Amino acid sequence: LDFREKKRGVDMAELGVEKGLAKAEKYYNDYGKRANELKAEGKKIIGYISALGPVEVLTAAGAVPFRLKGNVDEAITKGDAYMETIVCPFVRNVFDSSIKGKFSFLDGMVLPHQCDSLDRTSDVWRDYLKLSYFHFLNVPHVTDDPSIEFMKELLQLLIKTLEDYTGNKISNDTLKQAISLHNENRRLMRELYGLRKNNPPLISGTEMMKVLVAVMGIPVNESSELIKAVIEEVKARKPAADNDKKRIMLIGDQIDSVSITDAIEGAGAYLVMDDISIGSKMYWQDVDEDKEPLLALSERYLRKLKIPTTFVDTGGTYEENLNARFGHMRKYIDEFKVNGTILFVYKYCDPYGFEVPAIKSYIESAGVPVLYLEDEYSTSSLARMKTRIEAFLEMIA
């Protein structure tokens, strides 16, 4: 398989005709439209739901990795008939969208062993979506050498099931090619993030959110072309004069809506960086192309990716342990000149709930104030959140 060739029916020059940000907004507003078109062209669309989605393997199989998302503006009307209301509201909302047929173009899904809300509902996803392909990836939660070996075996099993399903052989060469494509995609996204270091940033947090969501639902080659177009467009902007607006970093998990970014920037701040699942967590760590592919992938997803469900044991002091888990956040704070952070966690998200005290104290110990927000995956209480954000910005002014 040559992933660099132009896909059938896709004129990549089209991205040059329609500016990158306009294209991203179109994909954001009509999420899944491009995947639906590719499905009609005969492509296999394989869904995933978190930063643990092994996108390189899906690409190597000739499939289109498609990240599932919910709709914060839509109430859960069917999902609660299948899942308890104490299940993470994000998971319930995504399942609700799925059971309503929002992602009817999906051929299959890879669901990771990550949190209780995913682990304990995997049978529900399998039994009620009735996809022709479903794979539960039993990702370990520790990062020692035996876990890396176990992860390699899990990826080998995933490859076998994908080969059987798609009919495409996933060789080391095709896997390396897919890894290279996704690494280049990550590099481009980091370049775009870098344009937020300016004061004021050249791209807003809301524009960035639309780009992040847009690229989750298209093939990696199209994603890279879109990011290039956005970079070119944003670089052409004339930098505005410096001002004293506060520079905010958003921390959280499955945040994929402009409602929160609009609330932050509408209150008079710049959203300049994030540590969220669809954002920097997806793009900051590459797969080592000099190592054997399965080993490199295992190390990337277990050791390099910093998520609450992975236990990092340094064997050192408490401070060393905190640095191993959250040190990247301090680097972001320094690099992007962050004045304040907003830690936004969904109700019933136990992994992040347990991490909140440690994250909050770690960041505050660096002299950066933290606003902790806990809410549903919904815009129903947005007014209350806006009030708290405004008060926080006044406090740190």
Regions found by a protein language model. Give the residues of each.
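A short, acidic, amphipathic alpha-helical segment used as a generic capping/interface helix at domain edges
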Residues: S98, E320-K337, F354-E355
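Acidic/His-rich segments in extracytoplasmic proteins that coordinate ligands and/or metal ions
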Residues: N93-D164
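Short, charged, surface-exposed secondary-structure boundary motifs
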Residues: E74-M83, D144-I148, S280-V287, S381-R384
